[in-house]
Structure formats: structure tokens, C-alpha cells
Amino acid sequence: MMPRLQQHKIILRQLGLQPYAPVSQAMHNFTEFRTDTTPDEIWLVEHQHVFTQGQAGKAEHVLMPGDIPVIQSDRGGQVTYHGPGQQVMYVMVDLKRAKIGVRQLVTAIENTVIETLAHFNIDSHARPDAPGVYVEQQKICSLGLRIRRGCSFHGLALNIAMDLEPFQRINPCGYAGMQMTQVSALQPGVTVADVQPVLVREFTRQLGYPTAKLQPWSLSDYLLSSHSSSSVL
């Protein structure tokens, strides 16, 4: 666990089911305009069907997207899939203020997922050669971050109770033949709503925050500047 950040609060936003592009732009705007005193935030969201290509993404890993759009992202990593039943958690953390490095944050996120899955009696692990969290050889959680001005954004995508078929249309995270799994395949009946509070509790514990404070989320709050628009999300 990291040194306690009791002097810093963290805000939780529940976004529900949202398209990828406007949420990504809102996250960029938040990061661009935050100050040294802006509280860190966690955003919980399920995205409508989308493939996102990370900065290292290669076109050959998108095999047959079909009717699912492919959007370029500036997060780390390669291509992945988002859809309903998958919990995406975006983590906007001021690393300078927290006095932690990127590797420490990645480890904290991976440990957050490992401990969350343990709560549901699922054994999982991280891999030194491939970011994310795995159950045996199957991937259950993808991870991709970007750091701007010492602050993180993007985050994790945990498969919970979703249609995994679209993963067969890509090489997930750039690995041909990578098999995906999800919480409900290992513990039938577990839902996104079951996992959310455990995931938030474990993340705040890993980084030593006090309890996250739930506040409403509105897209209009993040439409801050006309020059913050970008084609890379």
C-alpha cells in the first residue's frame, strides 16, 4: 500500500452507460484544466460497443471489426474492446502530489483488481511481460494509462458480465490468440453493480485515500474550452 493520502480526497463519479468519445474528451479536458488543488477523481463507466487503439496500436491487430467502430486513443497499449457489462474505471491522479511514479500506480491498479477478484473467490495475477490481470492464462482485465503534466488518466477495463465475442475480432492488446475471460464465467451471477463498490474500496485502500466521495457527473461540466478538442482520444 502507498503512503496515506489523508490530506487529499478523491471524488467518485458514476457515469452509467456512455459512448466512448465524449467521455474520453471530458477526461482530457479535466486533466488539461486541473490545478494543483483539484481533487483526484475516479470515473466508473460502461461504454457502448467500441474498439480503441492505444498509442502502440497496429492496424493488423484489428482483424474484422464489423459493425463496431474503431477509435484511436492516446492511452498506452494496443487494441482492446469495451462494451456493456465491462467495468471501466478511469483514474485521474496527481502523481506529483501523491509522490508516486507511474510504475507504482500501475502496480496499485493491478493489485486493486487482484484484491477485488479475491473478494469474489477468484485467484488472479499480474504478469511482468504484459500489463493487466490474468486468471491462469486468460486475461480478465486490461490496463492502459497516459500521463500529462504529472497527472494520470485512462485506467482499467474489467470484464464482468459481457459478451466476449468481439474480442475474437481483434488480437487483444496485440497478442494473437489471447483468450479472455470474465467474472461471471468464474462466479456466475456476479454483476457490475456487485463489483463496483469493491473495486472503488480497493483502489482507495491501495493509494491510501480516505473513502471516495460520490458526486454527480454531467458531460456539460467538462466542455471547458473549444481548443481542447482532439481527434485522438
From Swiss-Prot:
InterPro entries cross-referenced by the UniProt entry: aa-tRNA-synth_II/BPL/LPL, BPL_LPL_catalytic, Octanoyltransferase, Octanoyltransferase_CS
Catalytically driven reaction(s): octanoyl-[ACP] + L-lysyl-[protein] = N(6)-octanoyl-L-lysyl-[protein] + holo-[ACP] + H(+)
Residues involved in substrate binding: 75-82, 142-144, 155-157
Localization of this protein: Cytoplasm
Keywords for the protein's UniProt record, in alphabetical order: Acyltransferase, Cytoplasm, Transferase
PANTHER family given in the database record: LIPOYLTRANSFERASE 2, MITOCHONDRIAL-RELATED, OCTANOYLTRANSFERASE
Additional remarks: In the reaction, the free carboxyl group of octanoic acid is attached via an amide linkage to the epsilon-amino group of a specific lysine residue of lipoyl domains of lipoate-dependent enzymes.
UniProt-recorded name of the protein: Octanoyltransferase
Organism: Yersinia pestis
Lineage: Bacteria, Pseudomonadati, Pseudomonadota, Gammaproteobacteria, Enterobacterales
Recorded name of the encoding gene: lipB
